[in-house]
């Protein structure tokens, strides 16, 4: 259960970061309304708060989170931006998740 909870927390954290960065990208690259910067800032604030909910040291959390970020970014690429994924995308995502698992599931030393 703990693994599922951590994985979901990583996924939600990644979504808030991607939304917080994608909306300004729309403003800058596609000339969308400046009002998109308001939900972008809110999303990034939620992202920062979510990072505090992870159960391990900040650096380790960021390292493990990176693997989930890669996967969520590729899902975003496919479903939001409409770009097809390649076998290299799938291979890279698999490797990133493996790295995340190694970091996140390591035995914790309390010394």
From Swiss-Prot:
Signal peptide: none annotated. It is found in: Cell inner membrane. Keywords: Cell inner membrane, Cell membrane, Membrane, Transmembrane, Transmembrane helix. InterPro entries: UPF0060. One of its GO terms (cellular component) is plasma membrane. SUPFAM superfamilies: Multidrug resistance efflux transporter EmrE. The chain crosses the membrane at residues 8-28, 33-53, 65-85, 88-108. It is a multi-pass membrane protein. Belongs to the UPF0060 family. NCBIfam families: PRK02237.1 (NF002586). PANTHER family: UPF0060 MEMBRANE PROTEIN YNFA (PTHR36116:SF1). This is UPF0060 membrane protein HCH_03337.
């Amino acid at each position: 259960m703990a693994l599922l909870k951590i994985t979901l927390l990583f996924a939600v954290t990644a979504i808030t970061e991607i939304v917080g960065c994608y909306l300004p990208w729309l403003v800058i690259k596609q000339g969308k309304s400046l009002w998109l910067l308001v939900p972008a800032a809110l999303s990034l604030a939620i992202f920062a708060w979510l990072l505090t909910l992870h159960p391990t040291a900040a650096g380790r959390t960021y390292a493990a989170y990176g693997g989930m970020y890669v996967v969520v970014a590729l899902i975003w690429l496919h479903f939001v931006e409409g770009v097809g994924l390649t076998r290299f995308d799938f291979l890279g995502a698999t490797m990133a998740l493996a790295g995340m698992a190694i970091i996140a599931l390591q035995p914790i030393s309390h010394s």
